[in-house]
């Protein structure tokens, strides 16, 4: 738990690039789901906590759309089953985030 908290606290950087923000989101998310003791609620709380470094860096939140739920769960299951390469999960997160970034750009 201490190691996860130390890593999580290290993600708070106001000058983070988009790639660094996605990396922080992904690492926070998979790290939290691996230590969180309850089966139900892991995802909701993990998505909330994972957005904190993203928001701190000045970016809009990463939102996982309901229609992408199966892809989201598959990416997490792949990681939990031993595929410790986060590139697939980060790619999924980037795709979801791009939708949010596009909405923000349209609103301006």
Each predicted region: which residue ranges?
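C-terminal end-helix/capping segment
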Residues: 50-77
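Helix-hairpin-helix/helix-loop-helix acidic hairpins
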Residues: 1-37
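Generic alpha-helical secondary structure signal
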Residues: 3, 24-27, 48, 67, ...
């Amino acid at each position: 738990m201490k190691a996860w908290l130390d890593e999580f606290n290290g993600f708070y950087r106001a000058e983070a690039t988009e790639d660094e923000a996605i990396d922080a989101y992904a690492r926070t998310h998979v790290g939290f789901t691996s230590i969180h003791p309850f089966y139900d609620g892991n995802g909701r709380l993990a998505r909330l906590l994972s957005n904190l470094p993203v928001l701190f860096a000045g970016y809009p939140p990463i939102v996982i759309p309901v229609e992408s739920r199966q892809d989201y769960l598959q990416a997490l299951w792949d990681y939990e089953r031993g595929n410790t390469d986060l590139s697939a999960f980060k790619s999924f997160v980037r795709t979801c985030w791009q939708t949010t970034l596009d909405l923000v750009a349209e609103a301006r």
